[in-house]
Every structure is written in C-alpha cells, then in structure tokens.
Amino acid sequence: PEDGFIADTLNKKAFEVEEIIPLDTDTVFDIKVLPNRAHDSLGHHGMAYELCSCFGYTFKKDPRNKILDTIDKHVVKPLVTIDDEKACTRFMSIRIDGVKVGESPEWMKKRLEAIGQRSINNIVDATNYVQFALNKPMHAYDARSVEGSLRARFAKEGEVLMTLDDKNILLDTSTLVIADDKKVLGLAGIKGGKYSGIQTDTTSILLESANFEPTLIRKTAQKYDIRT
C-alpha cells in the first residue's frame, strides 16, 4: 500500500500517525502510541502485526531469527539475583566473551538514524536495535567492571550513580537499580552507569534483559528527569 493509505488506515483503525517522513529509499511513520498499547505496539514487530491485522495480511517471521537448541560452551551465564520480585518480575543475563567493539554495519546505522537514534558502536547499537524491533529494552555491561553477580535491588540511601551522559545522581531507597556485589551499575529500565559502559577495548560483555514494574520505572524517570 502507498504511504498515505497506510497512514489513513492506521488513523481510522488503530493509532494516530503524526508525521510521514520520506527518506531516500524508505519512509518513516511517526506514530502516537497510547499507553494502553505500549506493551505490544512500541516496537516495529508489534506495529507490523497491527498493520497485518488492518490489511488482512499474514505476518511472516524473519527467517534470520533462530532459537538455539544449545548454548555454546564459550557463552557463560552469570549469577543474577532479584531482591523484590514485584519490582522486577524477570531478569535474564548472559556473558559473552571474545567480542570486538567497532562500528555497526551500514544497514543498522541507517535504520537507527532513521528513527533518531545515534549510532554508538556495534554492541550498544545491537541492544538498541533489539529494543526498537521487539519493544524489549536491553543493556550491555563491560564484564570487567562487574564484581560478583548482577542484582536488581532498591538503592541504599546516599548511593550515587554517574550515568553514561556524565550526570551524577544521588539515589534514595525508592529507586530500583541494577548493581553488582559492591556498587550501583545503572537505573533499572532507564539508563546505565558510566563505570560499566562499553569501551573500545571491551572484550567481554554481560547482556541484560529484564521486566520491571512500569509505574515504578516511570516515577523514577520523572524523579531524576531522565528520558530515554
């Protein structure tokens, strides 16, 4: 279907299309997603399902997406701890060794830049790409900076976190954080800390994929005035 017809159909059946942005070989739709549909429609796959429903198409899964039956012996699972299962309902992590940090391929750069996301490096870009594709935020830690296990817990009064954009935040006990055995590594579901960020010489990473209580995360973002 043509771009205008797609926008008109979404406006009538699902969401408000605020802007159509033509690119050289693609088109970007700026779509307003209401809070009650954020869980399934803030990612490109979810929006693709919605479009298939609107136009009577069958959604075709990406053949490049594969589920591994076994985990390679070089991929090691780190210990993960959840202190409050209401605040963090699920927390998964895996360690990957032997990575090489560098530029992302051009196709990924273009896709991220098309939606206003600056390319940083192949590791960070991959986590951002998954977030926008699947509506599943992820985060990567430099494994060298993690002492012990990853833990989803509430901050201790007076703890301080320096975020990736060099902002020092004084935390309180209502703030859910990701920490290791000795220090805070990031604001859960919002922003990582600078100390554990991916560096050019990083060779081992910990990938985080977790589900946090959304109201708690929203309040934390408002409290510290952080929008990501």
What kind of region is each of these model predictions?
Residues 1-228:
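RNA/tRNA-interacting regions in translation and RNA-turnover enzymes
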